[in-house]
Amino acid sequence: MNKSENNKTVFLYVILLLLVLFMPAFLGCKNEKADTSSKNEAERHSSYTVTDDTGLTLQFTEKPKRIVSYSISTDEILMALVKPERIAALSRLVDDPGVSSIVEEAKQIPARVQGNSMENVLTFKPDLVIIPDFHPPEMLQSARELGLKVYIYKTPSDIKGVKRSIRQIAALTGEKEKGEAVIAKMEARIQQVQQRLANIPASQRKRVIQLRSEGAFYAPDNSFGDVCRHAGVSDATLELKYPSAMEITQEKVVELNPDIIFVPAWDYDGKHNPDGERRKILNNPSYRGMKAVQQGKVYTISGALVLTVSQYIADAVEEVAKMSYPEVFGKN
């Protein structure tokens, strides 16, 4: 082999050696770029935005895993949409059977929010705080000033609004499909009730009122009125057509003279025992001439159904219908 050929062989050997040494690094770099690209693509697909009822847009790169709920209705909706380990804290009312339908399920999440102090919420290290709009504006502002990711929603006043809230919270938690499943179940139950009531003529439909011993309350838009509409009865208080929400006098209650009186069973202060409330109404001299009192149609009804605005509003429709038309549904 001459000198020229020998040099050529050495050169080729060096090139081959360099390829062997640097090819893994080259491939590794290429794979790293591919992995990074795939990761970025996955993040783009998993990220989403939602806008709350104040117009504030929230950005998420992944589903929230430390959610804090500030109302019983949100508690109930969340428990139907996400696993318990994704909820950091629920509202204190979730443990009250007078207004909560998930007392047992809620035991899986021990933490509770108390009062309106946002500083206390920080201890839960939340990545999402859901607050209904009936809380004080200064509380909502404080939450945002503390850097918390806060979603504020409008409290629903009818079944349509409840479905909207479920869709909002489902989108917020990255669980849209589960949200639609919850709504579908609600709608199916309400439809079944209405089908059973279809043959009751308008002239035989019952007029009802929700009453406590202190009296009744009028609100032009209220969830109980919508429950009544779907349950084949009418909320007699809505006949008053007052310009705004207000208390109803005993005289007006007597004038309305409903077929049925429903007493919400919620002893919220230890002074409103459901049976005691019912007896007070039955024994009130002002009410003795009312047909509901005379016929003994003063019924206690679960506050957990008629006082909250979650998917359990479908249960409220069913319960009101059953209690109003036992001849259709059979006596409990």
Regions inferred by a protein language model and the residue ranges of each:
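Bacterial N-terminal signal peptides that target proteins for export
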Residues: K3-I15
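Bacterial N-terminal signal peptides
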Residues: V14-A25
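A short, structured surface patch at a secondary-structure boundary
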Residues: R66-F124, L128-D133, A236
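Bacterial lipoprotein signal-peptidase II cleavage site
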Residues: F26-S37
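Proline-aspartate-enriched helix->loop->beta-strand connector
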Residues: S117-I131, L148, T249-W266
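Extracytoplasmic substrate-binding proteins
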Residues: S47, T57, E138-R212, A216, ...
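Short helix-initiation/N-cap motifs at beta->coil->alpha
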Residues: D53-G55, K107-E119, P156, K241-Q250
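Alpha-helical, coiled-coil/dimerization segments enriched in small aliphatic residues
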Residues: V94-D96, K107, F217-A245
